[in-house]
Amino acid sequence: MTAATMELPHTYMVFVLGGKVFSFEARLLWEASTSVGFTEVPKFGGHLVGVTQMHGKIVPVLDMAGLLGMTKVPPPGGFIAVSLPGTNELLTGFTVDTVVGYAKIPPEDIQRCEDDTAVTPIPYLKGWVEEGKKFPLLDMERLVREQASGNTEASDVNQGEENV
């Protein structure tokens, strides 16, 4: 167990995108906001929508809906920035519809995916949270690493939001 995991045991960041609830491990959260201004990067391609400056760092901003194969619903009402443990260079921001907040979710309420390479209806799926209503737990660490390396094949799995 890492120090970050010990500081935030069983804690997850919850957000809404396209009317659906998603979550990821809170230990990866660097910042969450209801709005962050960013400079758009037109015609850049891919899922990069812009860049922003936060706490003296330039942060790329990606379209989370596009990464998950969903239809983009502008304008975003929320922003989350993720930083991978032990790396300063893998700081990435994402547009989301709404930042809900933190949730304590006991391990018994999480159904992990058996195999990370299994074909799933949602790119970057790590598991399912079964707390009242079932919603996806995303593998943000894998998502950020793949986007940073240019390996975006997992984000092309879906072509429509009906799968989410």
Per-segment meaning from a language model:
Residues 1-164:
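An acidic, low-aromatic, low-complexity terminal/linker signal
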